[in-house]
Regions:
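Extended, low-polarity segments enriched in aliphatic/aromatic residues
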Residues: 1-134
């Protein structure tokens, strides 16, 4: 998970609980502070970036996203990834079934949406966004 073990899931905890904790830790860090977020949606790998090993990108580079709202930013990035066609010969391109979600298709045990939904629930931000292309 984290090379410094700052965020660790207990062996009996689900990814859902870990995702909720990540949203809560994010809120604690950002609370009452000015913040702006930038995401480079490039080289989207089938596994989390935190893995010491990975595979080829699963979709073409999507672009750069920015927002004052980290929840809206994550939602916009995930939506953009899910609108992409799979790169042939990638883990997504070779997946046997399509779950309608490029991130879950390559890693079915990860429920990325739970972090976004929990972030919205605790007041970190909103899943609603307006995409402005430049």
């Amino acid at each position: 998970m984290c090379p410094q073990d700052a965020v660790v899931a207990a062996s009996d905890e689900s990814n859902f609980i870990l995702n909720c904790k990540i949203a809560e830790y994010t809120k604690a860090v950002l609370q009452d502070k000015a913040h702006f977020h930038i995401s480079f949606v490039m080289d989207v790998s089938p596994l989390c970036d935190c893995h010491p090993y990975n595979d080829a990108p699963i979709v073409p580079d999507v672009g750069i996203f920015a927002s004052f709202d980290p929840v809206a930013l994550d939602m916009a990035c995930a939506d953009a990834i899910n609108k992409q066609c799979a790169i042939r010969n990638s883990a997504l391109g070779e997946a046997e079934l399509d779950l309608g979600d490029n991130l879950r298709t390559t890693n079915p045990n990860t429920d990325w949406l739970s972090a976004v939904e929990h972030g919205e629930k605790i007041g970190l931000g909103s899943k609603d966004y307006e995409l402005i292309e430049i």
